[in-house]
């Protein structure tokens, strides 16, 4: 589930957040500097209770580029957290898939395994996506291992019935 938070400069934003019991962590993200380093940066992901605190990139022509390329463009691991071009950069798709390696040194998405601990899951109910003009708050409602089937290409998640069936399957295994 996602909550799009109203713009911070509006009077409505603090009230909505307060009523939901959500405090958005302050992040000092310099998107200008990040984009100077790599113009494919368009967001930042932060997952409390983990080491996930990284820029999010999307290559314009090669969906797998950041699987084996780092922020500076060098080839190798750990790569970057990224989305494929099938997802829009404004996070309005029914399902946005963020990719990243499960590194043995605990970096990238490796620490998402922390959510296998029920206490971590309960103490960290949200993760945050920061963009230049908005902050998105996502409620973590499931944490489970998934196979390598490409979700977006194998499920028509734009179809509300198929999307609901997909969510129902998640609720069954979580």
Regions found by a protein language model. Name each.
Residues 1-174:
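Solvent-exposed, non-transmembrane regions of membrane-associated and secreted proteins
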């Amino acid at each position: 589930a996602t909550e799009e938070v109203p713009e911070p400069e509006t009077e409505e934003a603090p009230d909505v957040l307060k009523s939901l019991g959500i405090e958005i962590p302050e992040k000092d993200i310099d998107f200008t500097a990040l984009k100077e380093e790599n113009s494919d940066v368009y967001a930042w992901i932060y997952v409390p209770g983990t080491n996930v605190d990284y820029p999010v990139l999307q290559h314009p022509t090669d969906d797998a580029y950041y699987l084996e390329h780092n922020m500076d463009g060098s080839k190798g691991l750990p790569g970057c957290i990224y989305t494929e071009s099938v997802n829009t950069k404004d996070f309005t798709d029914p399902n946005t898939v963020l990719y990243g390696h499960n590194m043995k040194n605990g970096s990238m998405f490796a620490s998402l395994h922390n959510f296998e601990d029920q206490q971590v899951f309960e103490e960290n109910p949200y993760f945050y996506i920061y963009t230049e003009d908005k902050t998105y708050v996502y409620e973590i409602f499931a944490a489970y291992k998934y196979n390598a089937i490409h979700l977006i290409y194998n499920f028509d998640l734009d179809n509300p019935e198929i999307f609901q069936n997909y969510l129902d399957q998640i609720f069954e295994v979580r």
